[in-house]
């Protein structure tokens, strides 16, 4: 019963009827879906049943019944008939037509000429000249299913061509050079055991970062130079994905393309080959000339914040020094990892609580981390809005109690190590705490928790905050942490501070695999000539005065000062001593007259800085790729017991693994070869199931990606 006196009956074939007080009022059979929909419409329109009850009985959403009623009111019963999908006429690519196309292509005709001579489109020509397989058999294949319901291709009836070469795109290159093509569309090269095709595993996670969408929003689709559209074979999509895939196979620099097979990378892009190094650099220079790299970074950050709100309540801020080995007059910075001051540029990086990259910019010369925190506050506030109260975590380089007070007033919490640590806490003040981190590990801390007041402005003011001290029982060392967070569990705060190593791991991994220190461009820009720098003449004069003072002190220690002041002292010795004292006075006076700082133009008139516009674009692409890899590593964890230690190494192996590519209807099947060990193969197979659930479309097409591993 679906209402008072109203009954719904339908058999397994789909035929049914609706009875009103025992009378069969509406009926339909399984071959007439229009009559079935009409019955649903009329039983609601006559008021004998509620729309919700009818929807439940017919097994559809209530909105669907409402839509049927609207369609019936507008177009009558004809509007209720289902629209027939699929081909409207027989395919033009008969076996005879395919043979004719291949004959003309073999004779040297271009794709456009073959299309004109045979009366089909250029797309049909490309399909026809692909690897020869009987069309009827290919269309007759039926997909099997995975355990979760996703489709996975069966063993092909006709084997794919091993190491198949992509279709040559010479006609499109000629069209691009003639100004007739905005961007070459991707054409998938089907085949088996294609090298590096495992890199396509990154696409679902890369789509979540919004990289391609952000690049299109900032720079526009296709190719633009000075705001004007230009023709191109390699569009923005191809350029960005080229950098992504080269990073995944451990060649993050542009010159690394010379060490990769251009055809293998071209297959990943849906093209016949990847751009050459010269072309890639030239096109990246065009993008850099737009001076919109910071906009790209902010667009990616907005997507990251929206997609992962659980990761953006805590931010880690740190600087990274990139050593410079060129011949330009670049300023020096201290490179901590080699304990040496040398020409270098300093970047400020912001990561989320899991260590994934969020923002990066070039630091001002000589700027401290405390100074960079002021820029960080503005950028994060722009991302999170005025009501959020995030936590900024940094090391002792950002120490400034005055700045801490300003940050708190601006709606931020701070978390840092205490500089100039005070007296140690007594052993009785420490309490044992346990904390379960995001990886499920139990952390044990001995912590002392109390409120302190930190002086600043020459002890005229005090900054009140919370101090959490960790005791290492083995060594007796105490680590003092300052924060304005009021979490009831001090172990949570301590763990957040100690998790700052994630930033160091980020730097280390990016240096090793993503070209963090890559120069990317040789262009330089003039340094600020009015910027005040240390005066080397002042330093030299002070050193001379110190040398004179040391000489006098050495003589006094050798002979005794009294020996120079005795009445019977050697006259020549006394005169020498007096002369040395006079020389010391002269040198001190000279040092005082020399200014401590002078404009940069006085000291180093040729000083320059590295132009980082192109590098910032490359960094944005690399950072998004790293974040996508991090997402895959997290998805891999339930499927691989050693994921905590080996997830990224397993992913790098998978990225370089050969795979089959096959188009089946509207799906693109990616079947990876087995990996180096059965457990690693099973782990990647589990990852494939996770990725299939995302329903990701290959960029630039309407093909749904379906991943699997052979033999699983």
Feature-to-residue mapping (PLM):
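Short, amphipathic alpha-helical "recognition" segments used to contact nucleic acids or chromatin
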Residues: 33-49, 94-108, 240-248
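Short alpha-helical "recognition helix" segments of helix-turn-helix
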Residues: 52-58, 113-115
């Amino acid at each position: 019963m679906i209402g008072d006196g109203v009954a719904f009956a339908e058999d397994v074939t789909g035929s049914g009827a609706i009875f009103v007080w025992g009378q069969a009022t509406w009926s339909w059979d399984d071959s007439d879906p229009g009559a079935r929909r009409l019955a649903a419409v009329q039983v609601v329109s006559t008021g004998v049943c509620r729309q919700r009850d009818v929807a439940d009985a017919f097994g559809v959403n209530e909105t669907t019944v409402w839509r049927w009623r609207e369609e019936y009111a507008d177009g009558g019963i004809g509007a209720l008939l289902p629209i027939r999908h699929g081909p409207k006429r027989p395919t033009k690519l008969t076996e005879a037509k395919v043979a004719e196309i291949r004959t003309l292509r073999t004779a040297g005709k271009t794709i456009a000429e073959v299309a004109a001579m045979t009366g089909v489109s250029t797309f049909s020509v490309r399909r026809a000249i692909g690897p020869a397989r009987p069309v009827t058999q290919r269309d007759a294949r039926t997909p099997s299913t995975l355990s979760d319901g996703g489709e996975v291709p069966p063993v092909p009836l006709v084997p794919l061509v091993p190491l198949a070469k992509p279709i040559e795109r010479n006609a499109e290159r000629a069209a691009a050079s003639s100004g007739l093509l905005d961007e070459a569309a991707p054409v998938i090269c089907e085949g088996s055991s294609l090298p590096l095709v495992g890199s396509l595993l990154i696409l679902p996670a890369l789509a979540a970062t919004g990289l391609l969408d952000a690049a299109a929003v900032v720079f526009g689709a296709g190719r633009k130079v000075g705001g004007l559209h230009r023709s191109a074979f390699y569009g923005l999509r191809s350029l960005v994905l080229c950098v992504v895939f080269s990073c995944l196979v451990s060649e993050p620099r542009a010159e690394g393309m010379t060490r990769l097979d251009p055809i293998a990378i071209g297959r990943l892009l849906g093209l016949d080959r990847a751009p050459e190094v010269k072309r890639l650099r030239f096109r990246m220079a065009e993008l850099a000339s737009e001076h919109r790299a910071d906009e790209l970074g902010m667009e990616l950050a907005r997507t990251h914040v929206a997609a992962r709100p659980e990761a953006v309540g805590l931010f880690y801020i740190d600087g990274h020094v990139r050593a410079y080995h060129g011949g330009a007059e670049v300023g020096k910075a201290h490179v901590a990892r080699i304990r040496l001051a040398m020409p270098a540029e300093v970047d400020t990086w912001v990561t989320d609580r899991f260590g994934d990259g969020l923002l990066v910019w070039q630091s001002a010369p000589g700027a401290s981390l405390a100074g960079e925190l002021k820029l960080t506050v503005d950028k994060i506030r722009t991302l999170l809005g005025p009501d959020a109260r995030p936590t900024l975590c940094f090391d002792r380089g950002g120490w400034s109690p005055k700045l801490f007070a300003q940050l708190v007033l601006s709606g931020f919490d701070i978390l840092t190590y205490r500089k100039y640590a005070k007296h140690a806490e007594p052993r009785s003040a420490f309490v044992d705490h346990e904390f379960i981190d995001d990886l499920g590990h139990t952390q044990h801390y001995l912590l002392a928790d109390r409120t302190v007041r930190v002086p600043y402005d020459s002890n005229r003011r005090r900054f009140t905050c919370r101090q959490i001290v960790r005791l290492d029982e083995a060594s007796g060392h105490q680590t003092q942490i300052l924060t304005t967070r009021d979490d009831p569990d001090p172990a949570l705060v301590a763990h957040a501070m100690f998790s700052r190593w994630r930033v160091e791991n980020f730097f280390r991994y990016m240096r090793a695999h993503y070209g963090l220190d890559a120069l990317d461009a040789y262009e330089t820009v003039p340094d600020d000539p009015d910027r005040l720098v240390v005066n080397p003449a002042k330093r030299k004069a002070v050193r001379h005065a110190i040398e004179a003072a040391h000489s006098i002190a050495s003589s006094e220690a050798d002979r005794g000062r009294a020996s120079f002041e005795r009445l019977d002292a050697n006259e020549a010795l006394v005169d020498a001593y007096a002369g040395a004292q006079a020389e010391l006075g002269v040198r001190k006076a000279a040092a005082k007259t020399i200014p401590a700082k002078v404009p940069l133009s006085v000291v180093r008139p040729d000083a320059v800085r590295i132009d980082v516009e192109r590098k910032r674009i490359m960094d944005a692409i690399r950072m998004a790729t790293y974040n996508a890899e991090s997402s895959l590593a997290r998805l891999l964890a339930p499927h691989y017991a050693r994921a905590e230690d080996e997830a990224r190494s397993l992913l790098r192996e998978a990225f370089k693994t050969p795979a089959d590519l096959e188009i089946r209807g509207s799906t693109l099947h990616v079947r990876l070869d087995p990996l180096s060990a059965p457990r690693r193969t099973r782990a990647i197979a589990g990852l494939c199931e996770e990725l299939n659930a995302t329903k990701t479309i290959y960029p630039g097409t309407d093909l749904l990606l379906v991943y699997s591993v052979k033999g699983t």
